[in-house]
Amino acid sequence: MPVKVQADLPVKEILESENIFVMDETRAVHQDIRPLKIMILNLMPLKEDTELQLLRSLSNTSLQVDVTFLMVASHEAKNTSTSHLNTFYVKFENVRKNYYDGMIITGAPVEQMEFEEVDYWDELTKIMDWTNTHVTSTMFLCWGAQASLYHFYGLKKRMLPEKKFGLFWHKVNNRKIPLVRGFDDEFLAPHSRHTEVPIDDIRACKDVTILAESDEAGFYLGMAEEGRKIFVMGHPEYDRMTLDGEYHRDNCLLYTSPSPRDGATS
């Protein structure tokens, strides 16, 4: 089923070239279907890449999806034009009275900072608190998962001795939970992070159920409040060349990133 986006969203043309059914508001109003309303708080630096990755994933549902992109007003994006943000994104103050079926809060390249040092932390905590009353289910990705585990449950992150980078094998813990229905018993997923929330700390938190984990990468997937909060420590949205791009970016910046771990060949 289609994903509804603004007619002139740049990644719309790419999605259509991949035979992904996307439509704009003009066409959507003629369909007598109640769409799923999804909000995406995109904190990633390359916002158009993340838009494309997440819209690809959302297009796999059998339901019509109405997507709204949210930005933080307290941060000035360095890699995305102001015109793009003003055209295709909304600010929290303009949507705080709305209700959504689902929300995705992405990762962000700020994990080596203390949470309170991030310039938009206060705004983010207000948004996370707002999801408790205005969003049916919220998915937190990578740093977003770390931020939410810290904000809601006081679970602290810690630095890793080396960047956790590449594809890693994971195992499903509880097949009775609908969220992991259809998962293979073991599956590969990408990670790209300098920090982690220790899995033993998460295990000790009675509010969070661990659904998938890795012997090498630690915690991967969990939920709280019967699925109203979903935590993903990796990057399931990444496409096949994203890790390669990050590897070359890091090395060009004189930061020596480890070669991506390729669990598929181990």
What spans do the regions from the language model cover?
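A short beta-strand-loop structural module common to alpha/beta enzyme folds
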Residues: 64-76
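Glycine-rich, highly charged phosphate/nucleotide-binding loops
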Residues: 81-96
